[in-house]
A protein has these predicted regions:
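Basic, polyanion-binding surface patches
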Residues: 1-191
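A short beta-strand micro-motif
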Residues: 16-18, 196-201
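Short, non-ligating residues that shape and space the ligands of small metal-coordination modules
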Residues: 209-210, 241-245
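Cys/His-rich finger/ribbon microdomains and the adjacent scaffold used
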Residues: 225, 238-241
């Protein structure tokens, strides 16, 4: 079975949030989909080890914020790769309170849904949670973020708790057996640059010397070896020492 085939399935990227007894929690998800129109219901897939999952089950409420294509990567880093036990993810985040009482994240979002849990299914490592949509709103007409764009632009890996997680070593092995003709076609279209790429071992973000990191003043063409020692991953804030050459 070739696992890269799963990358052909289409997903968006969403921020799931909930609250119980004054405790706000949230995480980044790519498995949110509408299951019925009347009544309007959404389904989300939540890993059992996520703190947010238990809060959703206990409170019976959750919100879904649809992230925009040009998302603030700090939101991805905090909500996607940090634990709610270790960090107040909502500090400095623009939110409103939904009818259900769930927090709704407005930053980097194009739409939101307020949901009440109506059922859940134990899938082993995950729960499939069905929520009735009690309210929704469109924030802007900007293009929503897709998982394909996220993966290709930021060269990111899915977190281990994601339903779509695939071990990088398996993907690398599958890539190594691509027919030579296909590899040559990819190489023919690839930009010519002799710099080395470096991957954050925490979140999978790839530093590409050809692009640099203009957000912190690192110009295109800057080798990772020449990046300042206090450089940190723009996604998960990991130190430079957590990057490995690929």
């Amino acid at each position: 079975m070739k696992l890269k085939a799963f990358h052909k399935l289409s997903y968006g990227l969403y921020l799931i949030a909930s609250e119980n007894k004054g405790r706000k929690v949230g995480y980044i998800a790519n498995t949110v989909f509408q299951v019925t129109s009347d009544p309007a219901q959404l389904a989300i897939s939540c890993h059992k080890n996520n703190k947010t999952t238990q809060v959703i089950l206990d409170s019976g409420i959750f919100s879904v914020s649809v992230l925009k294509k040009e998302v603030n990567m700090k939101i991805i880093g905090d909500f996607g790769f940090m634990s709610s036990s270790d960090l107040d993810k909502f500090n400095g985040i623009n939110t409103i309170t939904a009818k259900t009482g769930a927090p709704i994240v407005l930053d980097s979002s194009v739409a939101w849904f307020d949901c009440k849990v109506v059922s859940s299914v134990d899938l082993g490592s995950h729960y499939l949670i069905i929520g009735a949509v009690l309210d929704s709103d469109e924030i802007s007409d900007e293009e929503p973020l897709t998982y394909q764009h996220y993966r290709e632009k930021y060269k990111m890996l899915s977190p281990k708790n994601s339903p779509t997680y695939i071990d990088k070593s398996i993907l690398d092995a599958e890539t190594s057996i691509i027919p030579k003709k296909e590899l040559k076609e990819e190489q023919d279209h690839a930009p010519i640059f002799d710099g080395k790429s470096w991957v954050c071992v925490i979140c999978g973000y790839t530093y590409d010397p050809e692009e640099g990191d203009p957000t912190v003043g690192i110009l295109p063409g800057t080798r990772f070896e020449d990046v300042p020692q206090d450089y940190r991953c723009p996604v998960c804030n990991a130190a430079k020492e957590y990057f490995q050459e690929v």
